[in-house]
A protein has these predicted regions:
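Metal-assisted phosphate- and nucleotidyl-transfer catalytic regions
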Residues: 26-135, 158-171, 175-176
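TRNA-recognition modules of translation machinery and tRNA-sensing kinases, especially anticodon-binding
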Residues: 2-16, 23, 100-215
Length: 215
C-alpha cells in the first residue's frame, strides 16, 4: 500500500533538524488534544486509547539497530533501513522502558535518504533526518535539507545524478537558500494506529495499491 502523505510542511531559517522534530511534536500534541476535547464521542465509540505524552524520545538509527539486536537476540539483516518488524520491536522497547507510544529514530544512513538530505557533519555516512514511529509503524519522515550549492552538487554526483538535470532546483541554492527542512506525515497511518486497524487501506477514503486504481 502506497500511502499518500497529505500532511507536509517545510521550515526555513532553522538552526538544525531538531527544530523540525519539535514542531512535529507540537503538531501531534495538537491533533491528540483536538480528538480528546472535540471528538470525545467518536473516540469512545471507536474504543480509541489516545496517547498521553509531553515529549517524544529519540534514538539514533545505529543505536536502535544495536538495541533491537541485543534486546531480542535478533541478527541485523539490513544495515541501511528499519524492517517492519524492527519498527514494531523498537516501539515495543520504548513503550516498556519509557512508556512512550511515539519514538523518533534519527540519523538514517545516506544510502537510504534522498539526494537533498543533509549529511551529518560528525559522521557523513549518516544524515540529519528522522522517522517518527507510532505504535510500531512509521507515520512520518523528515529532516534537514542541503542549502549550500556546492554541497548539493557534490551530493548529486555521489548518487550518480547529473546536476544539469536539476538546473532549476539548483538555481535556488546558488542565489540564496536558507537552512531549511521539512516533514511528510501519513495521516491515514496515524489514524490506523489510533483505532488499532492493522490494514491502512481501511483508514483511507480511496486506497490505492497494485490492484486498485479506481475510484
Amino acid at each position: 500500500q502506497n500511502v499518500n502523505r497529505i500532511y507536509d510542511f517545510e521550515m526555513g531559517f532553522i538552526k538544525d533538524f531538531r527544530e523540525i522534530m519539535e514542531v512535529e511534536t507540537g503538531a501531534v500534541k495538537s491533533m491528540i488534544s483536538t480528538l480528546k476535547n472535540e471528538y470525545a464521542k467518536e473516540v469512545k465509540m471507536l474504543n480509541v486509547v489516545l496517547p498521553e505524552f509531553d515529549e517524544i524520545p529519540c534514538v539514533k538509527f545505529k543505536d536502535a539497530k544495536e538495541m533491537i539486536a541485543a534486546e531480542y537476540n535478533r541478527k541485523i539483516k539490513d544495515p541501511y533501513d528499519l524492517e517492519p518488524e524492527e519498527e514494531q520491536l523498537i516501539s515495543k522497547l520504548f513503550k516498556e522502558k519509557y512508556n512512550s507510544d511515539f519514538v523518533f529514530v534519527t540519523h538514517y544512513p545516506v544510502k537510504k535518504r534522498p539526494f537533498y538530505a543533509m549529511d551529518d557533519p560528525e559522521n557523513p555516512k549518516f544524515t540529519l533526518s528522522f522517522d517518527l514511529l507510532f505504535r510500531g509503524l512509521e507515520i512520518a519522515t523528515g529532516g534537514q535539507r542541503i542549502h549550500d550549492y556546492d554541497e548539493q552538487v557534490k551530493k548529486m554526483i555521489s548518487k550518480n545524478l547529473n546536476p544539469e538535470d536539476f538546473e532549476s532546483y539548483l538555481m535556488i541554492h546558488k542565489y540564496g537558500m536558507p537552512p531549511h527542512g521539512g516533514i511528510g506525515m501519513g495521516l491515514e497511518r496515524l489514524c490506523a494506529r489510533l483505532i488499532d486497524e492493522p490494514n491502512v487501506r481501511y483508514t483511507s477514503l480511496f486506497p490505492r495499491d497494485m490492484t486498485r486504481l479506481v475510484p
